[in-house]
């Protein structure tokens, strides 16, 4: 439900601005992919699959640790070795694999953090929509709003979601 669904819908949506068809937004795209993983958990897909649940939790731990390492390197001036050591200690992954990750973060600041930031924004928007709409909240409609605008900055996504739930509240008055 992650990248494939998001990119397929973007390709099918003819009325998107050209910039959204041609330029990918990391926080939106990777955020949607991670959100899809969280959604699977929220819907109970791992309830009868303890190994799948462990994989999900390990993936979430890795994503969170990447955010810390990315921020540590670019905001707090961690050395390459500090970032590698942190990732190895936190995730249990091999030093060689974590060195490759750290090298990627070094040349693409913010990219690793964008996964978690994007997913959290989508989750926050879903929870806000649920609070505002109560029993009128429809998960499918929410996903349609998130996906129908194509890749865009998270601030624009938030505006679209707010416009959607406000219009639903206005219709029910």
Give names to the regions the model predicted.
Residues 1-173:
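N-terminal maturation segment of proteins
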């Amino acid at each position: 439900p992650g990248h494939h669904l998001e990119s397929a819908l973007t390709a099918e949506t003819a009325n998107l601005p050209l910039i959204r068809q041609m330029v990918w937004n990391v926080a939106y795209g990777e955020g949607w992919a991670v959100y899809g993983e969280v959604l699977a958990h929220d819907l109970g897909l791992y309830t009868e699959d303890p190994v799948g649940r462990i994989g999900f939790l390990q993936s979430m731990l890795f994503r969170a640790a990447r955010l810390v390492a990315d921020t540590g390197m670019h905001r707090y001036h961690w050395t390459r070795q500090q970032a590698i050591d942190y990732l190895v200690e936190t995730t249990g992954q091999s030093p060689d694999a974590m060195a490759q990750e750290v090298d990627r973060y070094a040349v693409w600041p913010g990219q690793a953090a964008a996964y978690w930031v994007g997913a959290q924004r989508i989750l926050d928007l879903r929870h806000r929509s649920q609070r505002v709409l109560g029993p009128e909240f429809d998960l499918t409609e929410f996903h349609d709003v998130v996906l129908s605008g194509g890749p865009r900055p998270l601030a624009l996504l938030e505006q679209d979601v707010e416009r959607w739930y406000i219009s639903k509240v206005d219709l029910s008055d």
